[in-house]
């Protein structure tokens, strides 16, 4: 399995003070995962901590090959915090 970042995943990096390593850590070791649809490739919503302990929300494409592509990453919004309870 290989995980990579699409440029769209970097959209909020400056605003949220996150970098590629933060995104990859949160995507690789998520606390919470849910499928968003049954399309191919499948989209997953993931919540995970970055290297500084901040909770990130991510959307990851899962390909048949097992490779993954992060297409969205940002500081988790309040609406997602309840998912961890």
Question: What are these regions, as identified by a protein language model?
Answer:
Residues 1-85:
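Ribonuclease/tRNase effector modules and their secretory precursors
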């Amino acid at each position: 399995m290989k995980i990579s970042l699409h440029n769209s995943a970097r959209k909020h990096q400056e605003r949220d003070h996150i970098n590629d390593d933060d995104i990859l850590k949160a995507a690789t070791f998520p606390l919470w995962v849910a499928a968003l649809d049954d399309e191919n490739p499948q989209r997953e919503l993931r919540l995970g901590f970055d290297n500084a302990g901040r909770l990130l929300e991510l959307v990851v494409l899962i390909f048949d090959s097992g490779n993954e592509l992060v297409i969205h990453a940002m500081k988790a919004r309040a609406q997602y915090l309840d998912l961890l309870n």
